[in-house]
Amino acid sequence: MSTDSIEVAIIGAGITGITLALGLLSRGIPVRVYERARDFHEIGAGIGFTPNAEWAMKVVDPRIQAAFKRVATPNASDWFQWVDGFNESGTDPRETEEQLLFKIYLGERGFEGCHRADFLGELARLLPEGVVTFQKALDTVEPAADNSLGQLLRFQDGTTATAHAVIGCDGIRSRVRQILLGEDHPTASAHYSHKYAARGLIPMDRAREALGEDKVATRFMHLGPDAHALTFPVSHGSLLNVVAFVTDPNPWPYADRWTAQGPKKDVTAAFSRFGPTMRTIIDLLPDPIDQWAVFDTYDHPPNTYSRGAVCIAGDAAHAAAPHHGAGAGCGVEDAAVLCAVLHMAAKKVNTAKTGSEGKAALITAAFETYDSVCRERAQWLVESSRVIGNLCHDEVYWRSHRIWDYDIDAMMRETAEVFEAQVAGVARN
């Protein structure tokens, strides 16, 4: 392991982990990514990125935003429309219209969607060969006996690795979060929000024939009592992505998993009193259907995202309900800040030729800077995502724009200022 560089281990090869890896590599920081799956595999269907997230992509590495644009599907309208999916008269959705409750301007090409796997595939192609090691499930992280090696990572297959810094991008069921916060602590786990989402992709020719062009060409939120659904086009308009949310007062029945395939009848029943548009959309979904429990960190938010040379990012840090459609974008913001602070720390290591203790102190300062800059905003997103489905127009408007209009450049300036203050504090001590 090099003595004049900061070597980083990233746990998890999802969108946040690979985005972060690309940004660090572009800044000359050595990275290894460890992924428990057999290959690149992004579960889920559609995903969208808001304007702030796209700006953060460019800050991390302009190739990332270019990769997203290659797979993104433009909306026919630059307005996000919230419609009454419940009180719709008539029987044929091609001849009826859901009442527009309100709409929010997204900006030009401001909230485009894509298929998750398509985007992850584009990102993976940007990675140099050998950066990602698959079938590596993390067991523990602890200081290495030789402090020049930093942290010792033990995997469930009995192998080990070392790195100066460890970043957990391992999702909602994060092992790194458990290690960081304590396995039995309430903040170490995400908790059921008492909603689940039935998710599916409908071939666009079938959706267009059943619903009409206007209802499939752009982004809609269909509202009603105890259920609502988000629809938008993906895969260059060849598929309609559907996320149908159902309120569930019961505990999630599967202790060992948060996704399950189940009969569509429960989802059909939840939307049975809705208008013809939503009933038709549900009819077009497959049976059985993928059901996703919505877990988040709202009830027990972490009081820190870092400790020493270990930190968490993305869903591992701030798992949020998807009602804002901004969780993945918040992970990109995390990556932008982490790339910046680790680059600043690496430059100080290279110029000052610090020893192992000095390098460890700089990494700690970098991660504390990240926690200071990102955690408050990320946990606000978790809170707002939990409640937004029940809010009135004015609340939805300002909460949405608080996410979309975030000043990424100001965030990066704050990152530099906080890091320098952290380093100055280390020097005084």
From Swiss-Prot:
UniProt organism field: Aspergillus niger (strain ATCC 1015 / CBS 113.46 / FGSC A1144 / LSHB Ac4 / NCTC 3858a / NRRL 328 / USDA 3528.7)
Family as reported in the entry's similarity comment: Belongs to the paxM FAD-dependent monooxygenase family.
Name by which UniProt lists this protein: FAD-dependent monooxygenase azaH
Cofactor: FAD
Induction and repression of expression: Expression is under the control of the azaphilone cluster-specific transcription factor azaR.
GO MF term set: FAD binding; monooxygenase activity
Location(s) in or outside the cell: Membrane
Transmembrane segments: 5-25
Taxonomic lineage: Eukaryota, Fungi, Dikarya, Ascomycota, Pezizomycotina
Function per UniProt: FAD-dependent monooxygenase; part of the gene cluster that mediates the biosynthesis of azaphilones, a class of fungal metabolites characterized by a highly oxygenated pyrano-quinone bicyclic core and exhibiting a broad range of bioactivities. In the first step, the non-reducing polyketide synthase azaA forms the hexaketide precursor from successive condensations of five malonyl-CoA units, presumably with a simple acetyl-CoA starter unit.
